[in-house]
């Protein structure tokens, strides 16, 4: 089984639709403790940028408890020790096809790898495949990294003093985006399985 999964990963990483793939998993309610642990590791400065205010542990806990994994979509990147090093939350509005709001966090140890941009692209593809018209980002103006990701993706940014809103218009879904979404999920699941097997073999879990 391992050899077949490894063969799939080699073929997948060479797929023309998905260059330089980062394995991004769709997270479920069972991953809630991992999401909480990830967010609690953020420094005060990172919490301020992620939430727009200096969220304490209790506020972060309430945020995680209220995450609706059925309505919204939560994505995560795991390192080889299955630690959640980056995650994104794509929250859908009252009218799901109208808009969706994106938020992301990356641990300091995983910065500079382009994970924020990868998560943004993944969320955009999922939103597009659900016929969402606009993906929105609410950020502080000092969150230059997040705003740069949005601008590079073609978003329109409106500034309001110390805050900013970015709006990315999404095209209609297409056959290749739906295929890419399925392939990415299969790749991420296979990658996670191999990491889990590696940990078991090395007595880490």
Question: What residues fall within each predicted segment?
Answer:
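Helix-loop element at the rim of GNAT/NAT acetyltransferase active sites that forms part
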Residues: 37-52
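Conserved acetyl-CoA-binding loop-helix of GNAT-fold acetyltransferases
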Residues: 106, 112-127, 134-136, 148-152
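Structured alpha-helical
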Residues: 83-85, 130, 149
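A short beta-loop-alpha structural element at the N-terminal edge
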Residues: 22-34
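A short, internal acetyl-CoA/4′-phosphopantetheine-binding micro-motif in the GNAT/acyltransferase core
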Residues: 78, 103-112, 140
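Terminal substrate-recognition subdomain of acyl/acetyltransferases
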Residues: 1-22, 138-205
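Acetyl-CoA-dependent GNAT
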Residues: 52-98, 107
């Amino acid at each position: 089984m391992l050899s077949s999964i490894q063969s799939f990963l080699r073929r997948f990483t060479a797929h023309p639709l998905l260059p330089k793939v980062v394995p991004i998993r769709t997270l479920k309610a069972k991953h809630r403790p991992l999401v909480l642990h990830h967010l609690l590791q953020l420094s005060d400065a990172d919490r301020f940028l992620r939430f727009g205010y200096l969220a304490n542990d209790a506020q972060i806990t309430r945020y995680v408890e209220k995450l609706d994994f059925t309505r919204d979509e939560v994505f995560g990147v795991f390192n080889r020790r299955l630690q959640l090093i980056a995650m994104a939350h794509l929250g859908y509005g009252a009218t799901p096809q109208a808009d969706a709001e994106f938020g992301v966090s990356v641990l300091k140890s995983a910065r500079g790898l382009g994970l924020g941009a990868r998560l943004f692209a993944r969320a955009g593809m999922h939103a597009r495949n659900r016929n969402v018209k606009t993906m929105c980002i609410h950020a502080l103006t000092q969150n230059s990294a997040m705003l740069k990701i949005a601008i590079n993706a073609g978003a329109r940014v409106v500034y309001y003093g110390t805050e900013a809103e970015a709006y990315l218009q999404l095209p209609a879904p297409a056959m290749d985006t739906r295929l890419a979404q399925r392939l990415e999920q299969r790749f991420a699941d296979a990658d996670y399985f191999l990491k889990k097997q590696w940990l078991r073999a090395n007595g880490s879990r």
